[in-house]
Design a protein with these regions (language model features):
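Short alpha-helical segment that forms part of, or immediately flanks, the ligand-binding pocket
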Residues: 151, 173-179, 192
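Extended catalytic core of nucleotide-activated donor transferases of GT-like folds
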Residues: 1-64
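Acidic donor-binding loop of glycosyltransferase active sites
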Residues: 155-168, 181
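Donor nucleotide-sugar binding/catalytic pocket of nucleotide-sugar-dependent glycosyltransferases
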Residues: 51-65, 69-85
Length: 248
């Protein structure tokens, strides 16, 4: 709760306890601009007092460097699937997983429109922003589940669609790549561009996304995208081994 944080000297107390103070981005870089004016100024001042900032995507790195003139580093989103005994898929059904619910934050409606072009059953995870009457659509809404349950369930899907305009950690596209599931999504999200380069479109380019959905019906193109995203995942900084090397 921001109001509660503002009741005490957060940065002063942190600097008394720590030699270095670091802030880790959570959510899109513009999120604080939905706060009250007083809260926005308080958070901006706090950002300028941290010794270093960690950010999700390179565009976030540039944003924070610009407004704070501080040291900002990219903190890759990390998957520890192998540690939990989770293995990539080896069989799946003809079904589409979209990446969120019917709210602007997730872009669920746009994902649904694109997903319809596969002529397959469509599923969606249940997120905290799920709205009333979503269950009336021809979408199978998964129950709330743990991450382990989610990643195992995702393995049974043919393709992912994630037209999410809110760029943050990028876990959905990352999870898809782990399983070798091609995922259509927006540029600007590093996990999307790094792992699914052939399936990344500009923000709002629904026409391009629909063209890709139709193109993925071609088995050779599908296999190319499937193998590419899995290989990209294995050599990316989103794995534990390579992330450790990157941070060192």
């Amino acid at each position: 709760n921001v109001d509660k944080l503002m009741t005490f000297d957060m940065m002063g107390d942190l600097k008394k306890l720590c030699r270095k103070t670091i802030s880790m981005q959570e959510g899109p870089h513009w999120y604080f601009q939905d706060y009250t004016m007083e809260q926005q100024i308080w958070w901006y001042n706090s950002l300028t007092e941290f010794d270093m900032l960690f950010a999700h995507n390179w565009k976030d790195v540039n944003y924070y460097r610009g407004i704070t003139n501080k040291l900002v580093q990219k903190m890759p989103t990390l998957m520890l699937a192998e540690r939990l005994g989770i293995i990539p898929r080896n069989e799946w059904s003809d079904a589409v997983m979209i990446g969120g619910n019917m709210v602007r934050w997730y872009g669920g409606f746009d994902s649904y429109v694109v997903a319809q072009h596969f002529d397959m059953p469509i599923s969606a995870p249940s997120m905290g922003r799920k709205i009333d009457r979503e269950d009336e659509m021809d979408i199978q809404h998964l129950p709330y589940m743990t991450w382990v349950e989610w990643i195992k369930t995702l393995s049974q899907y043919y393709v992912g669609v994630h037209m999410m305009p809110t760029h943050a950690a990028g876990t959905f596209t990352l999870n898809c790549a782990f399983h070798g599931i091609p995922c259509i999504g927006y540029k600007g999200l590093d996990t999307q561009e790094d792992l699914h380069p052939l399936l990344s479109v500009d923000d709002g380019d629904m026409r391009g996304a629909i063209k890709l959905a139709k193109k993925l019906k071609d088995y050779k193109f599908y296999e190319e995208c499937s193998l590419m995203c899995r290989e990209n995942y294995e050599k990316s900084m989103y794995t534990e081994e390579r992330c450790r090397s990157y941070l060192e």
